[in-house]
Curated annotation (Swiss-Prot):
GO terms for molecular function: ribosomal small subunit binding. One of its GO terms (biological process) is maturation of SSU-rRNA. Belongs to the RbfA family. Keywords: Cytoplasm, Ribosome biogenesis. One of its GO terms (cellular component) is cytosol. It is found in: Cytoplasm. Its main location: cytoplasm. One of several proteins that assist in the late maturation steps of the functional core of the 30S ribosomal subunit. Associates with free 30S ribosomal subunits (but not with 30S subunits that are part of 70S ribosomes or polysomes). Required for efficient processing of 16S rRNA. May interact with the 5'-terminal helix region of 16S rRNA. Monomer. Binds 30S ribosomal subunits, but not 50S ribosomal subunits or 70S ribosomes. This is Ribosome-binding factor A. It holds the Pfam family RBFA.
Amino acid sequence: MNPAYRKAMLESEIQKLLMEALQQLRDPRLKKDFVTFSRVELSKDKRYADVYVSFLGTPEERKETVEILNRAKGFFRTFIAKNLRLYVAPEIRFYEDKGIEASVKVHQLLVQLGYDPLKDKEKKEEDKEEE
């Protein structure tokens, strides 16, 4: 099996297991419905898993959510070890995913410059339908 393919499969499986573990985590401060693990990146030696977290809320709430998850990373690592057949379960590190926020800012800048990609796409589709 291609090593890159295996790594991608492991990352995907870890992401699914983390979502399951999140539902079992008992922390009243954590708003589970608004937390999403957007991506998981395994290190080459598979000892570390960097997990990027998306969260709807204020910047303070997002920072607090990442801190709560980092405090519970032992719980997540144990859950992965019990459910995934690996020699060593990777150490989990949670980070705030700023990709969505950055894409919204880029979109806002484009709109300010007079270019709205969404409207242009709709306009092109309408033009194709008229032809």
